[in-house]
């Protein structure tokens, strides 16, 4: 049924079974080779940042991206030595944010300097599990009805940190399935399925740059 619907709508997708009977996974192929601007705010965290950059280089199939590191008031000599090491990498650009910390403003600042058609907002402590992670997110984000794509995030103890957000949960918004074992699929298997969400976290968020600009970027009154 999923295959027929894909053919009927003219949407290309690779349909496969999941471990749950009656539920399917659709992987949308990337159209063309658009540039993705990966935006990573950073303060002092040399080893954390290095691990993230190595993940992008060695454990990411889709490689047409630039990396924008936003240096945010670091104080350690170690991180500035590392920035100097990175200066020879043509994919990496370093911006300096000299004002007080404001997560929204920092990312808006970087987005204004981005050359990519797509923006990937990425925390420096995120590591990929599957090499095709960016390719898969981009395939979904290219769909005309999609403005942004989030990711399932897992804590080091193999429990869920984020599998989408629900507006109104816990007052303003809350993460679904927090602290549930990552190998569990949850209510109606929603913890393991591609689906529409009220919101997603910007810890790993891919957006069309055009949509981000139309929305006015992040609200800078919300600093964190």
For each predicted feature, which ranges?
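Glycine-rich, basic loop-to-helix element that forms the pyrophosphate-binding segment
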Residues: 97-114
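Donor nucleotide-sugar recognition loop
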Residues: 127, 194-224
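Conserved small/polar residues in nucleotide/adenosyl-binding loops
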Residues: 1-6
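Short aromatic/hydrophobic "clamp" motif used to bind/position activated sugar donors
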Residues: 119
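N-proximal low-complexity "stem/linker" segments adjacent to membrane-targeting elements
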Residues: 8-58
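Short, flexible, basic/aromatic active-site loop/helix in glycosyltransferases
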Residues: 151, 156, 168-198
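Acidic donor-binding segment of Leloir-type glycosyltransferases
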Residues: 57-99
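Conserved donor NDP-sugar-binding/catalytic core segment of glycosyltransferases
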Residues: 126-172
């Amino acid at each position: 049924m999923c295959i027929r619907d894909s053919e009927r709508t003219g949407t290309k997708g690779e349909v496969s079974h999941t471990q749950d009977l009656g539920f399917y996974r659709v992987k949308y192929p990337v159209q063309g080779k658009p540039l993705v601007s990966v935006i990573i705010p950073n303060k002092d965290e040399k080893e954390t940042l290095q691990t993230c950059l190595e993940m992008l280089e060695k454990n990411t199939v889709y490689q047409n991206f630039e990396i924008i590191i936003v240096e945010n008031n670091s104080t350690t000599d170690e991180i500035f030595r590392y920035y100097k090491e990175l200066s020879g990498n043509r994919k990496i650009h370093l911006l300096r944010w000299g004002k007080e910390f404001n997560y929204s403003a920092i990312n808006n600042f970087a987005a204004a300097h981005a050359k990519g058609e797509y923006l990937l907002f990425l925390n420096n402590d995120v590591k990929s599990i599957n090499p095709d992670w960016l390719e898969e997110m981009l395939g979904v984000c290219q769909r005309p009805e999609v403005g942004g794509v989030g990711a399932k995030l897992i804590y080091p103890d193999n429990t869920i940190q984020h599998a989408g957000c629900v507006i109104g949960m816990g007052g303003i918004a809350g993460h679904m399935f927090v602290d549930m074992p990552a190998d569990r699929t949850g209510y109606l298997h929603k913890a393991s399925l591609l689906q529409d969400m009220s919101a997603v976290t910007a810890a790993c968020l891919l957006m069309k740059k055009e949509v981000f600009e139309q929305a006015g970027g992040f609200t800078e009154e919300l600093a964190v």
